[in-house]
UniProtKB/Swiss-Prot annotation:
Classification via PANTHER family: 6,7-DIMETHYL-8-RIBITYLLUMAZINE SYNTHASE, 6,7-DIMETHYL-8-RIBITYLLUMAZINE SYNTHASE DMRL SYNTHASE LUMAZINE SYNTHASE
GO BP terms, alphabetized: riboflavin biosynthetic process
Gene: ribH
Protein source organism: Synechococcus sp. (strain CC9605)
Enzyme Commission identifier(s): 2.5.1.78
Pathway linked to the protein: Cofactor biosynthesis; riboflavin biosynthesis; riboflavin from 2-hydroxy-3-oxobutyl phosphate and 5-amino-6-(D-ribitylamino)uracil: step 1/2
Name the UniProt record assigns to this protein: 6,7-dimethyl-8-ribityllumazine synthase
GO MF term (any one): 6,7-dimethyl-8-ribityllumazine synthase activity
Residues at which (2S)-2-hydroxy-3-oxobutyl phosphate binds: D90, T91, R132
């Protein structure tokens, strides 16, 4: 019996793409910062001249899937991370955006076999979002760690 697990120390040669929603950028910029910190601490070159990392900004979380899909299909990335923050308002818009973003990101991973980390905060208030993006903890760091684990795991699995 084989057992497969991703490792966090296997970042050499890993190409990472990050798609960040600009809407609620007070939150998403902090998520990106935490994510980059994690990747850097685990050996990914996050410099402006990096050949290991690309970051794409989109208007909002609804647009995350289409850009993630394009990045996955181009064959240059072993793992993708989507970052966004959708905060509940007084209309059903929240439910529509969250449902479509989550389904879309999941479909990209299924259709392309490229792991796509769903790093979209879904909160009731801005305060809750800020707490998850740096005041109490930074989930961006966790999303970076998940990407490292999944990138490593996918490299370890037998290919079709």
């Amino acid at each position: 019996m084989a057992t497969f697990e991703g490792r966090f120390s296997d970042a050499a040669g890993l190409r990472v793409g990050i798609v960040v929603a600009r809407f609620n950028d007070l939150v998403t910029a902090k998520l990106l910062s935490g994510c980059l910190d994690c990747l850097k601490r685990h050996g990914v070159d996050v410099s402006e001249t990096s050949s290991q990392l690309d970051v794409a900004w989109v208007p909002g979380s609804f647009e995350l899937p289409i850009v993630a899909q394009q990045m996955a299909r181009c064959g240059q990335y072993q793992v993708l991370i989507t970052l966004g923050a959708v905060i509940r308002g007084d209309t059903p818009h929240f439910d529509v955006v969250v449902a479509e973003a989550s389904k879309g990101v999941a479909a990209v991973a299924r259709d392309t076999s490229v792991p796509v980390i769903f790093g979209v905060l879904t909160t009731d208030t801005m305060q809750q979002a800020l707490e998850r993006a740096g005041i109490k903890s930074n989930l961006g760091w966790s999303y970076g760690l998940e990407a490292l684990e999944m990138g490593s795991l996918m490299r370890a699995l037998p290919s079709a």
